[in-house]
C-alpha cells in the first residue's frame, strides 16, 4: 500500500502538531533551546482557534488591587470542583505572572490602565483572600481580542526562531513502536503527497473536539484530531465527561460573547426582567463560575422564565454601560452582536443561551506536558516520545470545570514547560530510533480505506446525527436513562462509519476526505464522553446529574480514563486526583462545599 503513494520522509528533533497558542509557544521554545523543530498545521497558524479567545488571560499581577498567586490557585482548585491536580495548578498559577510579562516583552498589545500598567478585569470565580474577599481583577486583557493578540505575537516569535512550518498538512496518525512515539504521518492538502515525520518527540497541540456537538463556540476545525490519534494508538483519554457550556453563546448562532462582558458590568435577566443570578449565587451573582451560571440559565428556561417567542433563552444587558466603555473594552462583541443577533448592545440586550465551549478532558499529561498512562500501580508512567498541551491535553488544571481566562494561561505556561522538558531530554541531531514498515503500512492502509469508502451514508449526515445526539443526550443536565440511551445511539452512529461514502477520491484539496478523517476523530471522542458520563454517578463541575445531584468525594474524587478497544467497545478505568502541592509555599486545599 505504501508503494501506491508518494511518501516523503523527514527527520526532526521535535514535531509539534497544531499551531494554536500552545503549539506555537512549545515550537519556538524548543527551537530557542537549539532543537530542530517543525510545526504541522491543517490551517494557517493565525487561523487557529486561539484567535477566537476574547476575554483575557489570568495572572495575579495585582495591577488593579491586591492579589496573590495562592489566591488564584485556591480559585482554580475550587473552580475545578476538586478534580484538578493541585501540583499542576500550583505550577500554572505560580508561573502565571512571569508568563504575562514574557508575553508583554514578546509584543502582546495588552490594554493599559491610566498609569500604563496592564489592564485587568474581573472574571467568574476569581476572588481574593481564598474566597473570603471581594472579586479579583485578575484577567489581563487586550480589549476583547486577547487570543488574537497573543496568537499573532506567538507566530511572529516562531518565525523569529526559525521554526519550520508545514502549513495545510493534515496529521493522520502517530508512528508508535513498542509503546513509544517515534513520529507522525501527515497528508499535504496542497499537492496530495504523504509525509512521514520522524522525531524524538511529538507534541499534540490540536485543540478540543467541540464540533462533536451541534451548537458550539468552536470553529468547524475543532475536531479533536490529537485525541483521535491518541485513542487509535491505544492510549486512554482523561475526564472526557466534563464538557463546558459557556453561559453566553448568541442565541441560534452559537457565537461567543465573552465573560468579560459580565466582568465589565453586564448582567443576565429572565422574562420578568429579574437579575436571577442573585438567587443562585448571592455573592458572585453573574460572575459565578461557568457551570453554575449555565445551570441557572437552563433552570430559568425550563421553569418558563425564558425570553423570546419560544421562551428558550435569556437576555444579557450591556445597555446600561457607557458607550465609551463598550467601544474601548468590548469592541469585538459589539460587532458580533450586531452581525449575529442584529442588536446594538448600547441600546438593546443580547439574546444568549449556554453553548458548548471547552473540553476539560483530553490526553492525560504531567505538568511537563509528557503524556502519561496507568501502568500497574504507577498512575503516571510516561509514554516516551509523546507530549500533549493545550485543550487537547488534560494536565489536569481545570478538573471538572475551567475558570474563564485560565485557558490562555494553560497554553503559554505548559507550552513553555514542554519546551524546557524537551530540551532536557533530547540531544540535538541525535540519531532516530527505527520505525517498522508495518507501522507505516497500517497508517497508510487506514487512510486509503477511508479515501475509497463507497458506502451509503454521507459524512455530513452521519456527523449531524452525532452532533444532535450529543446535544440532546450529553448536555447541561444529565440522567442515567438519557445517558444510557445516548451511549447506545453514539455506538450505533459510530458503527455506521463503516458505511460512509467519500465521493471525491482525489488527493489535492479534498475537503470530503478531510471531513471524513475529522469525523472519525470526533466519533471516538463522542463515544468515550457519553460512556464516561453514564458511569460517573455524581454531580461535579460541568457534569450535573439530576438523579445524583450531590458531589461524592468518597467514591468519585478520581479521574476517569477512557479508551476504545479494537472491537469498538469503551474501556473505563480510574486513578486518584493529586491532592498534594509541589512546594511548601502553599498548602493543599482540602475539599469543601462549592458555593459562590
UniProtKB/Swiss-Prot annotation:
Molecular function as annotated in GO: electron transfer activity; flavin adenine dinucleotide binding; succinate dehydrogenase (quinone) activity
EC numbers, comma separated: 1.3.5.1
Organism ancestry: Bacteria, Pseudomonadati, Pseudomonadota, Alphaproteobacteria, Rickettsiales
Record-listed FAD binding positions: 18-23, 41-56, 225, 391, 407-408
Membrane topology: Peripheral membrane protein
Species, as recorded: Rickettsia bellii (strain RML369-C)
Compartments where located: Cell inner membrane
The keyword Chloroplast is annotated on this UniProt entry: no
Listed name of the protein: Succinate dehydrogenase flavoprotein subunit
Key words, A-Z: Cell inner membrane, Cell membrane, Electron transport, FAD, Flavoprotein, Membrane, Oxidoreductase, Transport, Tricarboxylic acid cycle
Active site: 290 (proton acceptor)
